[in-house]
Amino acid sequence: MAVKADPGGFPQRKTSESRWVTAAQMRDVQRIAQEEFGIDILQLTENAGRSAATLALAMLGGKGRGQRVVILCGNGNKGAAGLAAARHLSNWSVRVDPIVSGVEEEAGFTVRRQLQILRQSGIIEPRDMESSDITVEDQLAESDLVIDALVGYGLEGPPQGIAAAVAQLAIDAKRPTLALDVPTGVNATTGEVSSPAIKACTTLMLDLPKKGVLQDQARNHVGELFLADLGIPVGVPERMGIPMGGLFSEGPIVRLRR
């Protein structure tokens, strides 16, 4: 079954209906949510993962059985969201191949927690995190969909090290790709495209839309645009002068049309 970049069935909004934020503004929103409202980062990554899994399943035609999804995960919170998505997709009968681009001992707390959950659930074994380039190439070639959860919105400049190598493998594989927040290699604030940069058919932005995604230079890398509510109280961005305007009044995932 062909992957649908815009599977339909989600509420639609115009891009002009929302305030688009920089990476710095997004950091402030998350900081206030955590420090003043007690929102835990594990909550945010879990919500992001479920949203990613929901959209991925829709892109696959709404049926998980017989589908294979490779999830490229970094060592930070975005990678943790990708691992959470792997668990949900596995629950929905999708065959998942989560790949962490780094040494587990050096990964952030949220990644290690999600890996622990996946292992306890029997979804992955420790050796699955030690794939060689050849194994990753094979997994990508056999996938129906790739989820890009390699680097977060705060990255400036090109991806480095293992993340760059994995991104290049994904680019070479030319599989339909769902990017979380912004595709790897695209600057969330300016839209500048580095090398390597993943070319997504669909981008699911998280909580607030990022300015860089709308820029002309990023258009060929972001594909169709969606936005997911992560559960941050609307009062947090609004007190920073970022009105939400009932953006999620019809559902937690919305399709954004230019």
Regions found by a protein language model. Give the residues of each.
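A cross-family phosphate/adenosyl-ligand binding-site feature
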Residues: 2-145, 151, 155-161, 219, ...
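YjeF_N-associated NAD(P)HX repair module
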Residues: 2-21, 143-258
